[in-house]
């Protein structure tokens, strides 16, 4: 829920998350002590949901994961990862400015991402 530009109110967010990504990086002997090589990323602010599986409302047709922190990213199998957010703080709100967030887990099918080298 974005506030109209240049306004601050209690029923909307004036500073929305714009950048949330899960990166796959190369960890090898070749880059020890140097920069990591980015292999790919998943944009958590633009998650396609063509089968309408999300239990949270879509934003312009996509699921967003706007939380301040991402608590975990785990590989489930060769095609899936789970991304989780533990919203255990009573004043944590990223979806509705006047309501504490639920804990959320997303199971994402990202086989090509996981296979990328």
Regions found by a protein language model. Give the residues of each.
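Sequence/structural signature of beta-propeller domains
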Residues: 1-117
């Amino acid at each position: 829920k974005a506030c109209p530009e240049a306004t601050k109110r209690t029923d909307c967010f004036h500073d929305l998350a714009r950048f949330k990504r899960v990166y796959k990086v190369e960890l090898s002997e070749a880059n020890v002590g140097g920069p990591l090589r980015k292999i790919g990323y998943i944009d958590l602010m633009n998650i396609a949901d063509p089968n309408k599986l999300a239990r949270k409302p879509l934003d312009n047709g996509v699921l967003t994961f706007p939380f301040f922190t991402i608590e975990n990213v785990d590989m489930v199998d060769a095609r899936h990862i789970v991304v989780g957010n533990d919203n255990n703080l009573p004043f944590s709100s990223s979806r509705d400015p006047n309501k504490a967030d639920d804990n959320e887990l997303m199971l994402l099918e990202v086989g090509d991402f996981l296979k990328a080298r």
